[in-house]
Amino acid sequence: MIGKPRGRRGVNLQILPSAMTVLSICAGLTAIKFALEHQPKAAMALIAAAAILDGLDGRVARILDAQSRMGAEIDSLADAVNFGVTPALVLYVSMLSKWPVGWVVVLLYAVCVVLRLARYNALQDDGTQPAYAHEFFVGMPAPAGAVSMIGLLALKMQFGEGWWTSGWFLSFWVTGTSILLVSGIPMKKMHAVSVPPNYAAALLAVLAICAAAAVLAPYLLIWVIIIAYMCHIPFAVRSQRWLAQHPEVWDDKPKQRRAVRRASRRAHPYRPSMARLGLRKPGRRL
């Protein structure tokens, strides 16, 4: 009598991650409908909802131990719709339809998202990747590409018409985003980022400010996120190169890696670039 309800509840919970993925697809497709009806605010809100559901479904699957090959395939298809097709069509309908090149650049973006997702799936099955590879994306992830696209619409909503709504700038930005998607540039995964304990209070303060900005100035917050993400890329490249040169720390925790890097800097105070330029530390004689 008691075992059956528990079993039934277990089966129901197993489909929860896939149900969340399907809901995210519905949100993404409905965003296109609102864009066609000239309601960009609703379209942007639904894309954000799709992104939130996309970020949660995988975590819920791991918590419930409900990971499956079918769920992974559905999630990949949802990413293609929500972060490839939907942002492209929303931006085209809202801003690019009057420009002859508009359709070409949104097609380029959508195709690059699909190629990027295909490469990601292929790398997941590649057993030859180094141990640190799971900490980095290869190229810009699809959700970040969608934020970059919606950022153009956010500029228009915040500041109205201007050079940022011109055909040449829109084409340049969309093309640049498309190139980043299929590039080989390493970009840090969020779950691989660790915050030292002494910065925890500052991080919580930043999160509180972001929560307030999401209500008071959501369009500006989108651009703060875009700029912050772009600024992290050089640090991600540097981190990936350092890890590639130090296989002895691949299995270490972030705190231990930071200690190794500090020790390395103390052991080699002069960087190669300083030596090439003939630079020296202040107060030292040649």
Swiss-Prot record:
Pfam families: CDP-OH_P_transf (PF01066). GO terms for molecular function: CDP-diacylglycerol-serine O-phosphatidyltransferase activity. It comes from the Bacteria. It is an enzyme of class 2 (transferase). It is found in: Cell membrane. This is CDP-diacylglycerol--serine O-phosphatidyltransferase. InterPro entries: CDP-alcohol_PTase-I, CDP-diaglyc--ser_O-PTrfase, CDP-OH_P_trans, CDP-OH_PTrfase_TM_dom, CDP_ALCOHOL_P_TRANSF_CS. GO terms for biological process: phospholipid biosynthetic process. Keywords: Cell membrane, Lipid biosynthesis, Lipid metabolism, Membrane, Phospholipid biosynthesis, Phospholipid metabolism, Transferase, Transmembrane, Transmembrane helix. The keyword Transmembrane helix applies. Its EC number is 2.7.8.8. Gene3D superfamilies: 1.20.120.1760. The keyword Transmembrane helix applies. The chain crosses the membrane at residues 15-35, 74-94, 95-115, 135-155, 167-187, 207-227. It catalyses: a CDP-1,2-diacyl-sn-glycerol + L-serine = a 1,2-diacyl-sn-glycero-3-phospho-L-serine + CMP + H(+). It comes from Mycobacterium tuberculosis (strain ATCC 25618 / H37Rv).
